[in-house]
Amino acid sequence: MSSRNPIQLLDTITINQIAAGEVIENSISVVKELVENALDAGADEIEVETLGGGQGLIVVKDNGCGMSSEDVALALKRHATSKIGEFSDVFSLSSFGFRGEALPAIASISKMEILSCPRAGEGSRTIIHGGEIVTSEAKPRQVGTTISIDSLFYNVPVRRGFQKSPQTDRMAMRKLLENRILSVENVGWSWVSERQQEFHIFKHQGFAERVAFVMGEGFMQEALRVDKGGNLVRVVGFLGSPGFHRPTRLGQRVFINDRPVDSTFISKKISEAYSMLLPPQRYPVFVLKLYLPPEWCDFNVHPQKTEVRILREEFVGEFLSETIGEVLARPQEVSVFETASTLPALRFFDEQLPESALEGLQGSNVLPVVKLTPSSSGSLPFLDREPDPLPVDRQTQISWGASQEVRFLTSLGKIVLAEDSEGVHAIFTESARKHLFYLSLVENHQHNYKSQSFLVPLCLEVTPQERIFLSSHIEEFKLLGIEISQMGPCVFSIESAPTFIGEEELKLWILSLAAESAKVDKRAMTLLIKEALTQTIFCKTLRAFDISWLSLLWQLGKPEKAFDGSQIRRLVLDEDFIKE
């Protein structure tokens, strides 16, 4: 029988490091907690500075009430808070934080410096390494607090290894701060990233100005104002017009009692109101602030406090549906411009390929069916090629791999029966055709896209978050034949693009990629850009690609690039299919 370690109490540092695993996921979590502390301290000017997406350095400076050296030492202890006194206070919160876990958790996994001064007292400087106070001394400062975080996760290297790229964190950081700009008015915000000023919002700037800054002038030009409710329930904000929509829900900002939340329930209710007004697979864009009685909201669901339980959810849902429906039903001026998503050339973006179209299309070692080199006209050579002849000798044998022989039996419409040492296989020729065509595009067009220069460069206006994506991937787009240059803070010029994609669909395609960029790191995004362009060619030119089943069998059976068993089964159907 194995021996068991005795039960013992964990030390404070270990407890805080474990808590940090829940509360502090990355540098964005650190900034979120420090900014919320600043707001709870009554600050109306908050400055944030980051390096390496926050992984190198984080500095949050505020003009709040400040702390004495004694308060600083107490704040570094777990569950020390000024926000609540008993559990019932959780259901009537007027502050952003309340657990008292964040500061000690951050201190336990970083090198921290706190410089603070209360309104009636002297300033102090406290240095903490891994949760232990190293130095505490008097230091003059104006009223307020500055917290600097260096070497995040330095003593938990496993956590550090799971961090995303600085670029990904930088984009997430921007969204976090944008949400604070929108949710808390009468507060000035400043963010310096990589030693460059990202933005400076003055505290006197109103809600509409802030929405225009975050969502872009294009959104505000046709935005619909929302303001309805009374003392019990109220919703204010802006809805995007039905002509302003996005391929994902990333353009949706929801706040409950000035707290940014991820609410599938609210998003669904609003999307239902738009359901008959948007193209398929498109989502409305909006900024909405919902105010509910504090006792109706339970934010104590997740350490990040982005989830919320609503006590009278059905009532709130009906209120939102009715309000959004009324706003959308108001008479609106009709735009004389046709939106990009309604252009006939873009309808393929709304059509979902069947799963069989891409089944088994990646990870294969099949040689290309035909060398695809764009001609001077920009067309592909197989567009004018006659299909291969269909007749074939019944006893034709084809190598299926390094040591297998495949013998053709017969064809049944779209299915070819072939036999090898394992038995009879039914090959679904349409899936195989798409498979081979896609692989040809991947291998032959990775660095060979025919481009055209625009007589007048296209102007693309983007949001600040989309700007970060574009400015970081200019070289990747250039390799694909898309020349992009930055003309202003949120304005880009597209000077050339592949011949097979139109001007308006090019803009939509780029913005769709920008929406996806928040989900992956930079390396994965580079691959996604290349794959997305390949799939665009795939959608546009697949119908013109023809191949006989004999040629198809020959391609699948090339011995120098043989399939293994798992790859074969992506393209062949088993005996159950034949019986049907």
From Swiss-Prot:
Gene3D superfamilies: 3.30.230.10, Histidine kinase-like ATPase, C-terminal domain, MutL, C-terminal domain, regulatory subdomain. Disulfide bonds: none annotated. HAMAP family: DNA_mis_repair. GO terms for cellular component: mismatch repair complex. InterPro entries: DNA_mismatch_repair_CS (IPR014762), DNA_mismatch_repair_MutL (IPR020667), DNA_mismatch_S5_2-like (IPR013507), HATPase_C_sf (IPR036890), MutL/Mlh/PMS (IPR002099), MutL/Mlh/Pms-like (IPR038973), MutL_C (IPR014790), MutL_C_regsub (IPR042121). Keywords: DNA damage, DNA repair. Belongs to the DNA mismatch repair MutL/HexB family. SMART domains: DNA_mis_repair, MutL_C. GO terms for biological process: mismatch repair. Pfam families: DNA_mis_repair, HATPase_c_3, MutL_C. It comes from the Bacteria. This protein is involved in the repair of mismatches in DNA. It is required for dam-dependent methyl-directed DNA mismatch repair. May act as a 'molecular matchmaker', a protein that promotes the formation of a stable complex between two or more DNA-binding proteins in an ATP-dependent manner without itself being part of a final effector complex. One of its GO terms (molecular function) is ATP hydrolysis activity. This is DNA mismatch repair protein MutL. CDD domains: HATPase_MutL-MLH-PMS-like, MutL_Trans.
